């Protein structure tokens, strides 16, 4: 039988305002990247070790307020409480979502492909860092019709993976870019723009040109990982997925290795599907689409290094919470019930 990751509650937060849901999450380590010295940055070393010291670690949630105009907010959760950082209405772009990323003890939002709004210190006065090659006529990297998506990505270095959609817009992602960000020089530029190679997947659809959809991306130890939830253009909530897979890919989207690949899900006659989200740890969070599938609607973890699944045991009274991120021993959970009702910061008690 499968091993189980057991969680215990450190702290529960009940937001005082009405928020929609968790768009994406991150973690801040207690360490400033500047303290690590510029040398390590030149070498592209990890600014944020996956060990995530418990000392001063904070969790981040990108969400939106229920009240009109539905402004974005970043919630910063620590053992002392919850801080809300409201993002201005200039973030409400009809085409582009903001992308949250974290860097040591700082975090940023990539805004409309063109700039980074970078929060350091007490987060009261963010810096605006323009992305050098985002504006025509210099933009050779991102196509004009690429739209930025908020989907959770993780990076342990300078290259930040970002999900995009182009040509047709369903609020999905079938393309990705890598943003090279130097937090010391305060410079950023787009490095590449690609789709995932569809023919590498056993159950790809030859009848269409649709690239695999991307749920989440991760850069770790100079390797790029992508989780795809198949190619279907129809509603997966209604019809289920065609396939899902976890792959190590090149910046050009070439599939180097498949770590996980489902069967053809449409063949079984029963709707199914699993979404994947990378974390600040070795684990990928797998969330089933339907409650009546083999997993009974329960999330699982997949270890990238050991290539094995784990079950998750939530703390008592929190079985309706979903897991959103992991960093070292810390886990970030949330309860969604027609809005973001509770947030949990939990600790990994052990694996049984």
Question: Whereabouts are the PLM-identified features?
Answer:
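Blade-level signature of beta-propeller repeat domains, shared across WD40, Kelch, NHL, RCC1
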Residues: 321-352
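Repeated scaffold domains used in trafficking and secretory/extracellular systems
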Residues: 18-24, 43-51, 91-104, 135-154, ...
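Short beta-strand elements that form the blades of beta-propeller/WD-repeat-like
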Residues: 8, 26-27, 56-65, 99-111, ...
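Beta-propeller fold detector
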Residues: 8-13, 83-89, 127-136, 189-197, ...
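An edge-strand/N-cap motif at the start of beta-rich repeat modules
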Residues: 1-40
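Structural motif
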Residues: 67-74, 114-120, 168-179, 233-247, ...
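Short loop/turn segments that connect beta-strands within beta-propeller blades
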Residues: 77-80, 121-124, 181-185, 250-253, ...
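Loop/turn-rich, solvent-exposed surfaces of beta-rich toroidal or solenoidal domains
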Residues: 229-230, 264-299
């Amino acid at each position: 039988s499968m091993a189980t990751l057991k969680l215990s509650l450190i702290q529960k937060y009940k937001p005082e305002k009405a928020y929609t849901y968790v768009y994406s999450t991150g973690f801040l380590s207690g360490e400033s990247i500047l303290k690590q010295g510029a040398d390590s940055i030149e070498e592209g070393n990890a600014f944020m070790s996956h060990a995530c010291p418990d000392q001063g670690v904070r969790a981040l949630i990108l969400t939106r307020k229920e009240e009109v105009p539905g402004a974005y907010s970043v919630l910063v959760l620590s053992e002392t409480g919850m801080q809300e950082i409201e993002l201005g209405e200039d973030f409400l772009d009809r085409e582009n979502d903001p992308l949250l990323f974290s860097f040591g003890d700082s975090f940023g939002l990539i805004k409309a492909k063109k700039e980074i709004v970078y929060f350091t210190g007490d987060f009261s006065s963010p810096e605006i860092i323009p992305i050098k090659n985002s504006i025509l006529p210099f933009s050779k990297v991102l196509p004009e019709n690429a739209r930025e998506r908020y989907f959770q990505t993780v990076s342990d270095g300078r290259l930040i993976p970002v999900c995009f959609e182009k040509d047709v817009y369903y609020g999905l992602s079938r393309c990705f870019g890598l943003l090279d960000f130097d937090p010391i020089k305060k410079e950023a530029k787009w490095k590449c723009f690609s789709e995932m190679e569809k023919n590498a997947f056993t159950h790809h659809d030859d009848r269409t040109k649709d690239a695999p959809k991307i749920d989440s991306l991760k850069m770790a130890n100079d390797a790029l990982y992508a989780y795809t939830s198949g190619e279907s253009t129809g509603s997966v909530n209604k019809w289920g997925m065609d396939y899902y897979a976890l792959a190590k890919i090149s910046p050009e989207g070439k599939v180097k290795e498949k770590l996980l690949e489902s069967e053809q899900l449409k063949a079984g006659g029963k709707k199914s599907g699993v979404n994947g989200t990378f974390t600040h740890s070795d684990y990928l969070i797998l969330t089933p689409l339907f409650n009546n599938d083999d997993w009974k609607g329960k999330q699982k973890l997949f270890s990238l290094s050991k290539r094995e699944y784990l079950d998750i045991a939530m703390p008592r009274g929190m079985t309706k919470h979903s897991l959103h991120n992991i960093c070292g021993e810390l886990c970030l959970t949330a309860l969604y019930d027609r809005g973001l009702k509770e947030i949990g910061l939990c600790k990994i008690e052990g694996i049984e």
